[in-house]
């Protein structure tokens, strides 16, 4: 199962805000620094960790200060996923899921800047929303995600 997330850049705080697709009017967004992921896997996340954030349908690791175990970037327009992502990101995410050390924070930050910000900077897109697919995680979902149309622009 996967939870679909909207991603919006908050330029005032220089963070990416994540929230479930179709739930823009419910709950509050989950924010985190673009380069805040540590170089190694975080400890196990308790089942109730982050439940107060009202982000239904997300794995519990999504609420970890270290970020989710696996974050698969997908753009509905160019269909870029971890399958064809540069710098062996799928292997990195798989290692992180297994609790092994991964690439440096700088490497992860560079990847997201390349993928997430390239269209905005080079193509001049004003709508700074992208869609993320969060899945492939060893943690259980908090609850089943609400059905939504992946290709509906947020």
UniProtKB/Swiss-Prot annotation:
- How is it modified post-translationally? A fraction may be phosphorylated in insect cells and HepG2 cells, a human hepatoblastoma cell line. Phosphorylated in vitro by host protein kinase C or mitogen-activated protein kinase. N-acetylated in insect cells.
Q: Which GO terms describe its biological process?
A: DNA-templated transcription; symbiont-mediated activation of host NF-kappaB cascade; symbiont-mediated arrest of host cell cycle during G2/M transition; viral genome replication
Tell me a GO cellular component.
Answer: host cell nucleus
Region of interest (Mitochondrial targeting sequence), ranges: 68-117
Name the keywords, alphabetized.
Activation of host NF-kappa-B by virus, Activator, Apoptosis, Host cytoplasm, Host G2/M cell cycle arrest by virus, Host mitochondrion, Host nucleus, Host-virus interaction, Modulation of host cell cycle by virus, Transcription, Transcription regulation
InterPro entries named among the record's database cross-references: Transactivation_prot_X
Top-level taxonomic group: Viruses
Where is the protein situated, by its record's location annotation? Answer: Host cytoplasm; Host nucleus; Host mitochondrion
Q: Which cysteines are joined by disulfide bonds?
A: none
Role, per record: Multifunctional protein that plays a role in silencing host antiviral defenses and promoting viral transcription. Does not seem to be essential for HBV infection. May be directly involved in development of cirrhosis and liver cancer (hepatocellular carcinoma). Most of cytosolic activities involve modulation of cytosolic calcium. The effect on apoptosis is controversial depending on the cell types in which the studies have been conducted. May induce apoptosis by localizing in mitochondria and causing loss of mitochondrial membrane potential.
Quaternary arrangement and interactors, per the entry?
A: May form homodimer. May interact with host CEBPA, CFLAR, CREB1, DDB1, E4F1, HBXIP, HSPD1/HSP60, NFKBIA, POLR2E and SMAD4. Interacts with host SMC5-SMC6 complex and induces its degradation. Interacts with host TRPC4AP; leading to prevent ubiquitination of TRPC4AP. Interacts with host PLSCR1; this interaction promotes ubiquitination and degradation of HBx and impairs HBx-mediated cell proliferation.
Q: Which family does it belong to?
A: Belongs to the orthohepadnavirus protein X family.
Q: What is this protein called?
A: Protein X
Query: What is the organism of origin for this protein?
Result: Orangutan hepatitis B virus (isolate Somad) (HBVoru)
């Amino acid at each position: 199962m996967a939870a679909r997330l909207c991603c919006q850049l908050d330029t005032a705080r220089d963070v990416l805000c994540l929230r479930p697709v179709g739930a823009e009017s419910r709950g509050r967004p989950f924010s985190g620094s673009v380069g805040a992921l540590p170089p190694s896997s975080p400890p196990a996340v308790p089942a109730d960790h982050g439940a107060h954030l009202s982000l239904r349908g997300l794995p519990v690791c999504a609420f970890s200060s270290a970020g989710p175990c696996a974050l698969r970037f997908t753009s509905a327009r160019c269909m870029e996923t971890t399958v064809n992502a540069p710098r062996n990101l799928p292997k990195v995410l798989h290692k992180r899921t297994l609790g092994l050390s991964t690439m440096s924070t700088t490497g992860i930050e560079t990847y997201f800047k390349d993928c997430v910000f390239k269209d905005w900077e080079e193509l001049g897109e004003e709508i700074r929303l992208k869609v993320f697919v969060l899945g492939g995680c060893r943690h259980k979902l908090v609850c089943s995600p609400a059905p939504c149309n992946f290709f509906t622009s947020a």
